[in-house]
């Protein structure tokens, strides 16, 4: 009888402890997951740099000779040493270099401008140095965008849907105290980004780029000399998009309403104005014509071909984190199972990919997997599961070309937008995932565009950058051209 009483007490104590443990697990689940590396970690730079309520101030302190040498040798993309002041805090011995792809080449060949985009790598010369926890800050020059808002808008939409994407803010750039220009500041997709989004036990990161052709393998007879870079210089400001064949009918479902263009009076119209005051789409001319060439070799298009690791060299060449063959095998295994439609939840971060697809398709960005060039995205793998992280949207909203005018851009197909890859096909063949994708598209239309999200973004940005653009000494456009483009957006 006495033993029975003790057992009853013991059971009661155990149950009480169990209840407390359950409560703690729920109350502190985020902290527990963060410690285990299963979820993101809050970073100081989220507010110190990317609080979009105010523009950040970036003063690059650099020897004039080094600055000029860096600009003159921009295509080498070599790091130089500088100090950087941000909001009154000085970071010493920071690495800086020009960045870009076609934009860098165009600016390098244009004697009238040195307005390059830049990378600031805080730990390049000083191990462990960061900017409020950020390892690398990207400063984009808003090339080929008279509105100065396209890329910021797309990143704002990614944040609105809660997709994994870089934080953004506008930055007033000075060089040795002299105003250089207003840029878009972005969180680089590297270690800090992974820590913020995925926690301490991050996976493997790649940036495949079919433009990095190396010795030409996987690209047949293609030669970079066949590309007409002469037409990649910033075009005129009449908004006349370059024409190309686009005969595929729109696959827009009846349940998703396309946003309509608003004129200056606030009225909506079915057709967007072409008098946008912005540079039209970039005209990329390739030998043999658009229809006969696709830059998608070495696995950059994420299509499964076979089990040979060498078939995916473009992915491995784009490694951001250190990787080995066992990591590569997990990627190929995932691509194979995705192509066969096997256990997609094991091999794809489905919800984030659907959010990525919705914003990316909404952006009509042909300089990407949805165009003819398999680049401008990051591939993230963790535990055999694949995810995509967006990148480079200055040519969004039809700026790349390849459409038959503004009407085609507005009515761009949404079911088969990623024509250059089969990676998303199995998702679209599943009714549940397809429906969720439509839901995210509709959310962008009804909540972000029509529900005030875009208006809030637009009013905030205009109030922040109008005067900075007006006095920008390196701007690609006149202030009047900016006003025309911004008013049309």
Tell where the protein language model's regions lie, with residue ranges:
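Phosphate/dinucleotide-binding and metal-coordinating scaffold of catalytic cores
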Residues: 1-489
